[in-house]
Regions:
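N-terminal beta-strand motif that seeds the catalytic metal site of vicinal oxygen chelate
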Residues: 1-19, 77-78, 133-143
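Vicinal oxygen chelate
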Residues: 3-13, 42-45, 64-143
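Amphipathic alpha-helical "stalk" segments
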Residues: 5, 39-43, 48, 111-112, ...
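Core segments of cupin and vicinal oxygen chelate
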Residues: 9-60
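A short local loop/turn or secondary-structure capping micro-motif enriched for an aromatic residue
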Residues: 59-63, 137-140
């Protein structure tokens, strides 16, 4: 459990719908939660990391597009590195569930040590998520 990453993000609208997306569509697990009249939060086991969904009435969206290799990507975003098998399985599930892609699955850094397949989606509260798999995972931090 040491070195588990934690990220807290705002959820506008229906918190239950967003929890359902992470659990039923992405296959994550629901963790601890707390509901109060004017605030609520829920932890999601995001591939071994703590993603906390905080109910919010405020919009925090300031999205920009930045070029990375050959594709513009949305900033801000967060995501996870998956092994190739899990990535392909999730890619198929997202298509079957008719999840709209912000960026369709594509290969970047082709024929480079950083080669990866990546895709970007949004949760029901418009938080952008990147899902990727690297051909050489050990190259992630320049190893």
């Amino acid at each position: 459990m040491a070195k588990t990453f934690h990220l807290a993000i705002p959820v506008t609208g229906n918190l239950d719908k967003v929890i359902e997306f992470y659990c039923n569509v992405l296959g994550c697990k629901k963790g601890n939660s707390e509901i109060h009249p004017f605030s609520a939060w829920c932890d999601i086991d995001f591939w071994g990391n703590e993603l906390t969904l905080h109910s919010s009435v405020n919009e925090f969206k300031v999205n920009e597009r930045h070029l990375v290799d050959k594709e513009d990507v949305t900033i801000p975003h967060f995501g996870v590195h998956l092994d190739a098998e899990e990535f392909q399985s999730l890619k198929e599930k997202l298509s079957q569930e008719n999840v709209e892609f912000v960026n369709e699955p594509f290969i970047r850094f082709e024929e480079d040590v950083l080669e990866q397949e990546t895709m970007f989606i949004k949760d029901p509260s418009d938080n952008v998520i990147e899902l990727k798999t690297m051909v050489n995972p050990d190259a992630l931090f320049g190893e």
